[in-house]
Amino acid sequence: MKLEVLLLRHGQTQGNLEKRYIGKTDEPLLLDDMESMRKISALQKRLEQEGIAGSQKLFVSPVLRCRQTAELLFPGQEQVVIDKLREMDFGRFEAKNYMELSADPAYQAWIDSDGRLPFPEGEDRECFIKRTMEGFRQMTEQAWRENCGQIAAVVHGGSIMAILSCLMQDDYFAYQVPNLAGYAFQYEGAGKIQAVRRIEP
């Protein structure tokens, strides 16, 4: 059975605004930001146009920014929390930005590796992709068990890159998205994916 999947990145937080590595830090959305609220409204209209404004099953990463975004986009809909869809663990780089890390040799080594080295005291990309794909399978298997043809997940930029790069056998950074953007596609299991399209406000 084909499954229509929507993956969306959460809305903007203070850490995003300051270009910080925000993984396990549990930040709220910037709800007083008029531009963010305008984008949420525009994204809701886009989802209606795509016919995915009321997905049959709604999954979320457990952190506040994802749960708040899901409530704004799909008000009142039950949220199924998938712990394995948490953002990457940035380890020692957590909550810091480029300016604060630029003098750190470990950060320069990570940059030079194209992000392939593990974050000091954090995750490496391979482990993160493996964990995230376990979360993706958890979602799709639950949907098929419950005969759902359409699911949405409000997750992280890293989660989207991990899932799409794995399914498409493509470059990890090819699927970077800003806040409140993501991808929709049809999934048939066993890595079969089609009709991939980018979704943004």
Model-derived features: where do they sit?
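Active-site-proximal alpha-helix that buttresses catalytic centers in soluble enzyme cores
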Residues: 2-3, 8-77
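Generic beta-sheet signal
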Residues: 5-6, 56, 147-157
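Short active-site segment of divalent metal-dependent hydrolases/proteases
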Residues: 13, 159-160
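Glycine-rich phosphate-binding loop signature in dinucleotide/nucleotide-binding domains
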Residues: 47-54, 139-150
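Short beta-strand scaffold positions
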Residues: 60-61, 130, 154-155
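Phosphate-handling substructures
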Residues: 73-131
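Domain-level recognition of soluble alpha/beta enzyme cores
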Residues: 171-195
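Short, solvent-exposed aromatic-acidic interface loops
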Residues: 196-201
